[in-house]
């Protein structure tokens, strides 16, 4: 199902902003992929990239066992941009010198720019950049010239304009580098001569055509959760093959308020899909009885989901393909050597090894914001496209500790109130994710003239662009006040509300 388009390769050296670099490139309507630094030059040539970007990373170029690239990558005739560690590695590999200075640079830094260079065309001679480095390039390789400096960094950027090889010590991909997107655009269009041929409208059209050709007259099965990713994947495949697609919606009893009914109404009635809803709440709760460890909960739910799904699939006769709503961050996080597993993904892995289906993952090239854009192109209701991210294990990981039906109901009702008030305040699309969870905490309160000892509800709301990092949302006090009063008054068994003001990192967005 490969679609021909101009390609930029982002070579991953383990930096924290690697996915952000890829997203910034795509914001210019240019397609890019992230590959590990271990990818051979031969494999890179086969991909026929029009430009290559080296990311940052935590290593020193002169350290033992540090990530390297083959020198031949610079001889492909493909424009190269090195960022931070990628800048240092470019200099080091081509004969320059990298040192560790006495004074390091972190944070906002003014950079002085030679805007006669194509890389900095149309950019001010002095502007704000974002630095985060310990080492620096002290001598540039032969054939290069310095095109930017800072007070502490003599080579903030360098260029071999004949070979179209560039390096920048700062991070153009972060918002704090005020000219970053302009500079990346210059590299893509003025240096590499790329066309902006990546759009969600063309993606959807091409993907529908490719799915039709791949599937032919065979049958396809989709595990539908009602979340954004699986919903967009299902509609995309349905547009291609219609009634050859059957969706199985496993209602594990861990959904938000009225969510199961909403999913059924949208996909069965509005889109006229073959939809099987399996009400398996009692089965899942039985398996989770007495379990409090979050990873154990995830694994039990994942395994039981597969069992239920397989049972339903077995009733349908011969099925040739399985649709998954895998998106690009899932692929990157599960497929590179440079990042650690934080939590097990519900959607990646976990499938039985002897699975008889071939996988269709129509969204595996897309970031979340691109998935939403495709959803809008396909005519999926705006409310569903902008539905809050919801983990596969559902409320099981928003009820901390052991799960009971009573705790689930408390969490559902509190969460529904929070979501309703956020919508009424017009904040739905300004906050990346918001939800109520039930910590395993009870506290003393006074309601009426009586002492109470009831549950605490924690509210969590974050701003983000990609969920890789996030900050806590500054919700107006009057909105929080109304949410708090409503939950305490309307949800039985709750006497205290707290608001989580932790960013990611150090915390994750979900509590479990």
UniProtKB/Swiss-Prot annotation:
Residues 198-387 form the GMPS ATP-PPase domain. Pathway: Purine metabolism; GMP biosynthesis; GMP from XMP (L-Gln route): step 1/1. GO terms for molecular function: ATP binding; GMP synthase activity. It catalyses: XMP + L-glutamine + ATP + H2O = GMP + L-glutamate + AMP + diphosphate + 2 H(+). Residues 7-197 form the Glutamine amidotransferase type-1 domain. Disulfide bonds: none annotated. Its EC number is 6.3.5.2. PROSITE patterns: GATASE_TYPE_1, GMPS_ATP_PPASE. GO terms for cellular component: cytosol. The keyword ATP-binding applies. The active site is at residues 84, 171, 173. ATP binds at residues 225-231. Keywords: ATP-binding, Glutamine amidotransferase, GMP biosynthesis, Ligase, Nucleotide-binding, Purine biosynthesis. Pfam families: GATase, GMP_synt_C, tRNA_Me_trans. Homodimer. Catalyzes the synthesis of GMP from XMP. This is GMP synthase [glutamine-hydrolyzing]. It comes from Clostridium novyi (strain NT). The lineage of its organism: Bacteria, Bacillati, Bacillota, Clostridia, Eubacteriales.
